[in-house]
Curated annotation (Swiss-Prot):
Task performed by this protein: Catalyzes the attachment of threonine to tRNA(Thr) in a two-step reaction: L-threonine is first activated by ATP to form Thr-AMP and then transferred to the acceptor end of tRNA(Thr). Also edits incorrectly charged L-seryl-tRNA(Thr).
Protein's recorded name: Threonine--tRNA ligase
Chain positions covered by the region annotation Catalytic: 243-549
Cofactor, free-text remark: Binds 1 zinc ion per subunit.
Subcellular location(s) per record: Cytoplasm
Entry GO MF terms: ATP binding; metal ion binding; threonine-tRNA ligase activity; tRNA binding
SUPFAM superfamilies in alphabetical order: Class II aaRS ABD-related (SSF52954), Class II aaRS and biotin synthetases (SSF55681), TGS-like (SSF81271), ThrRS/AlaRS common domain (SSF55186)
Named cofactor requirement(s): Zn(2+)
Species of the source: Orientia tsutsugamushi (strain Ikeda)
Record-linked Gene3D superfamilies: 3.10.20.30, 3.30.54.20, Anticodon-binding domain, Bira Bifunctional Protein, Domain 2, Threonyl-trna Synthetase, Chain A, domain 2
E.C. no: 6.1.1.3
Catalysed conversion reaction: tRNA(Thr) + L-threonine + ATP = L-threonyl-tRNA(Thr) + AMP + diphosphate + H(+)
Family of the protein in this entry: Belongs to the class-II aminoacyl-tRNA synthetase family.
Recorded name of the encoding gene: thrS
């Protein structure tokens, strides 16, 4: 007999070789009906695997986070089985679980179509209804390689060859479909998600490398309840309507083109939004005691080597070959640039330390809060680029706080206050905080890490904020905080960060004179609120579905005339608004008023000032608000006051 320890701490005895299925059945039939797998000593296992030693056992139910992941993994395998039956010449590659769903990569010459997805979905339903057993088998490596070679599944052969010799080769069989997989899985295909949907097809590369073979990726989602699936599909539909790439084109905010992949062309309206946000942040940080600086966009390789970025970040840096340039132009051959490459900066921190080091600093100068709206460049594979959300050229609302170890808590508290106010102003009242502590591989002593971690936690607790812990997810140079926003359709976006850094001050020889007169290293707090302007603007566009609040709207008021008698009055009002720093546009064309209103509301202009003969004679304005059919009559001074009231 063996002891089985249950989640409530109780101990029951079972025969050696008892399965998780037998244990859960003996405890509760209702629990068993919801159980999809078991956790044995915190390791997920199939229900039918024998347990031969004393262990802790916990049921993994279909409504738990782990249960849903297993459900989605099952559905990915059913997708692969369906594709192999319908398109036998297709190779199946890999099919992991992702947030809210799963995908499976396939190697196939002919692209999958939307009609194909419908046929595949029906075949998947048939497989689920058939309720084939899902069985785990352990094969010899040679047998597995030979089997998949015969099946012409050459990607599976590559995967097996990469598995360490010390690991067993586990295979899952359901019906006549066999796949390489670690598991665990449900006992049969009938357990699998009856509530699923294949959502899209996209291109992919083997191993995510654009130099490798092209693949086709089918995405899907799966849920334990129909209501959950319906809710997710509604959010997905909303996300598609709000897609910033689509709205960016329609509203003429920005565009991308092949000649500058990953680098946006900002149109007038989009650049207006950019400048509004920049001016707002600049004002906020000035009030918070920051100095604003500007550092070179291009820096020499030697500095990047000293900072450590050349070693760790080289593949993501854009570099310039100055040797060739200088030889072509017969310039001086012994300059420092001829011996080293230049690189476009991927971040601002090394440049900020150069400014800090330029003059001797005293402990009285700390904390020193240094900010920059720095233009940065990072190489991202073309397949990873995604509108404004993933770019190669971007501007950060970056700042570095040079402080002592004893000042970390106070500076963190001040930063959190600033960050929350900014998010509130942009329409994100809820902020989640994640705290990431020391990783296994790290710089600095345990004593320094203890102090830094305690300082961050103390700051969060002083603010009364809830937080979650990401164990071991801190940077190698210090712990960090991440700040997550929730948008209008429930999606989470990580934007703000605060990272403690003990390493960079040492590498770049930053120091200050302590109260005892000795040289000491400052601590650097790397912090950002928005992250990159580009990504944050993309988030704003999707959050507001393009209908930006008055203070952010590139055009705040459209002044339109109904009749010729109102043209002069319209021109006069338009000029008055401009003189009061209100972003106004004027339409005195002969188009019908309904056409004008529709055009400006399609362009998401918050307010339309409608002027006819009556308004011209009375000196009043008929105002229509975006999304409303009602008109309100006000004066120009009231309109100006209303817009100013909304300014941040």
């Amino acid at each position: 007999m063996i002891d089985i320890i249950l989640p409530d701490g109780s101990v029951k005895q079972y025969k050696i070789g008892v399965t998780g299925q037998e244990i859960i059945q003996s405890l509760s039939i209702s629990l068993f009906k919801k159980t999809i797998a078991v956790a044995v000593n915190n390791e997920l296992m199939d229900l039918y695997i024998p347990i031969i030693n004393t262990a802790t056992v916990k049921a993994i139910t279909i409504d738990s986070v782990q249960g849903i992941e297993i459900l989605r993994h099952d559905t990915a395998h059913i997708l692969a089985q369906a594709v192999k039956k319908l398109f036998p010449d297709t190779q199946v590659v890999i099919g992991p679980v992702i947030k809210d769903g799963f995908y499976y990569d396939f190697a196939r010459d002919k692209p999958f179509t939307s009609k194909d997805l419908e046929i595949i979905e029906q075949e998947m339903q048939d497989i689920i209804t058939k309720n084939d057993l899902i069985q785990r088998e352990v094969w010899l490596r040679a047998k597995a390689i030979e089997f998949f070679k015969q099946q012409k599944e050459f990607y599976k052969v590559k995967l097996i060859e990469e598995i360490p010799e010390s690991e067993e080769i586990s295979i899952y069989r359901q019906g006549n479909f066999v796949d390489l997989c670690r598991g665990p899985h449900s006992p049969s295909t009938g357990y699998c998600a009856k509530y699923f949907k294949l959502t899209k097809v996209s291109g992919a590369y083997w191993r995510g490398n654009s130099k490798n073979e092209s693949l086709q990726r089918i995405y899907g989602t799966a849920w334990g309840k129909k209501s959950d699936l319906d809710s997710y599909l509604h959010r997905l539909s909303e996300a598609q309507k709000r897609d910033h790439r689509k709205l960016g084109r329609e509203l003429e905010l920005f565009h991308f083109q092949d000649e500058a992949q990953g680098m946006p062309f900002w149109h007038s309206k989009g650049w207006t939004i950019f400048k509004i946000i920049k001016d707002y942040i600049s004002c906020q940080i000035q009030r918070a005691g920051y100095i604003e600086v500007n550092t070179p966009m291009v820096l020499n390789q030697k500095l990047w080597e000293k900072s450590g970025h050349w070693e760790k970040f080289r593949e993501n840096m854009f570099t310039l070959d100055t040797n060739a340039a200088e030889q072509d132009h017969n310039l001086i051959k012994d300059s420092i640039e001829t011996k080293c490459a230049l690189a476009l900066k991927p971040m601002n921190c090394p440049g900020h330390i150069q400014i800090f080091n330029y003059t001797i600093k005293s402990y009285r100068d700390l904390p020193l809060r240094m900010a920059e709206f720095g233009s940065c460049h990072r190489y991202e594979p073309s397949g990873a680029l995604y509108g404004l959300m993933r770019v190669r050229s971007f501007v950060q609302d970056d700042a570095h706080i040079f402080c002592t170890e004893d000042q970390i808590t106070d500076e963190t508290i001040k930063f959190c206050h600033l960050l929350k106010q900014v998010y509130q102003d942009f329409g994100f009242p809820e902020v989640k905080i994640k705290f990431s502590d020391r990783p296994e591989k790290r710089a600095g002593t345990d004593k320094i890490w203890d102090k830094a971690e305690q300082a961050l936690i103390h700051a969060i607790q002083t603010l009364g904020e809830e937080y979650t812990i990401n164990r071991g997810e801190g940077a190698f140079y210090g712990p960090k905080l991440e700040f997550i926003l929730t948008d209008a359709i429930g999606r989470e976006w990580q934007c703000g960060t605060l990272q403690v850094d003990f390493v960079l001050p040492e590498r770049l020889n930053a120091s200050y004179i302590s109260s005892e007169g000795s040289k000491k290293r400052p601590v650097i707090l790397h912090r950002a609120i928005l992250g990159s302007f580009e990504r944050f603007i993309g988030i704003l566009i999707e959050h507001y579905s393009g209908k930006l609040p008055i203070w952010l709207a590139p055009i705040q008021v459209a002044v339109v005339s109904i009749t010729d008698e109102a043209v002069n009055y319209a021109k006069q009002l338009h000029q008055e608004l401009i003189d009061n720093n209100i972003r106004s546009t004027l339409d005195i064309s002969n188009q019908k008023i309904n056409y004008k209103i529709r055009n400006f509301f399609t362009a998401k202009v918050p307010l339309i000032a409608i002027l006819g003969k009556k308004e011209s004679e009375s000196g009043k304005i008929a105002i229509r608000t975006l999304g409303s059919q009602e008109q309100h009559v006000i004066s120009s001074s009231e309109l100006i006051a209303h817009i100013r009231k909304n300014k941040k």
